C-alpha cells in the first residue's frame, strides 16, 4: 500500500510529523551553522509548523469535548488559544 501524504494523514499524525520537523529545525538553528538566509527560511518554516501543530491541538480538544459529552455537542466551542501578540 502506498504511503499516505502529509495532507491525507490524520491530524494526530500530522501533529507528530510537524512537531518532529519543528524540533529538527530548532536543533539546526541552535547550532548556529546556518546562514542568515537559511535561518530566515527555517524560521518561516518553523512558524508554519507551529501553526499546524496549534490547529491540530485545537481539533483534538474539540474531539475530546465531543467524546466527553456527546449528548451536548453545543458545549464543543472552539478553543481560543492565547494571543501571540506581546
UniProtKB/Swiss-Prot annotation:
Enzyme class: hydrolase
Iron-sulfur is among the record's keywords: no
One GO cellular component, as annotated: cytosol
The keyword Nucleus belongs to this UniProt entry's keyword annotation: no
InterPro entries, A to Z: Exonuc_VII_S (IPR003761), Exonuc_VII_ssu_sf (IPR037004)
Coiled-coil boundaries: none
GO terms for biological process, alphabetical: DNA catabolic process
Keywords assigned by UniProt, alphabetized: Cytoplasm, Exonuclease, Hydrolase, Nuclease
Localisation: Cytoplasm
Protein EC: 3.1.11.6
Catalyzed reactions: Exonucleolytic cleavage in either 5'- to 3'- or 3'- to 5'-direction to yield nucleoside 5'-phosphates
Any GO molecular function: exodeoxyribonuclease VII activity
Subunit structure: Heterooligomer composed of large and small subunits.
Similarity comment: family membership: Belongs to the XseB family.
Free-text function comment from the UniProt entry: Bidirectionally degrades single-stranded DNA into large acid-insoluble oligonucleotides, which are then degraded further into small acid-soluble oligonucleotides.
Protein name: Exodeoxyribonuclease 7 small subunit
Organism: Xanthomonas axonopodis pv. citri (strain 306)
Amino acid at each position: 500500500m502506498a504511503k499516505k501524504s502529509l495532507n491525507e494523514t490524520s491530524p494526530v499524525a500530522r501533529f507528530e510529523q510537524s512537531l518532529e520537523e519543528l524540533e529538527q529545525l530548532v536543533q539546526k538553528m541552535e547550532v548556529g551553522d546556518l546562514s542568515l538566509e537559511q535561518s530566515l527560511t527555517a524560521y518561516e518554516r518553523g512558524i508554519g509548523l507551529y501553526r499546524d501543530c496549534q490547529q491540530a491541538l485545537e481539533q483534538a480538544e474539540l474531539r475530546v469535548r465531543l467524546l466527553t459529552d456527546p449528548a451536548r455537542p453545543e458545549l464543543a466551542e472552539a478553543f481560543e488559544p492565547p494571543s501571540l501578540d506581546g
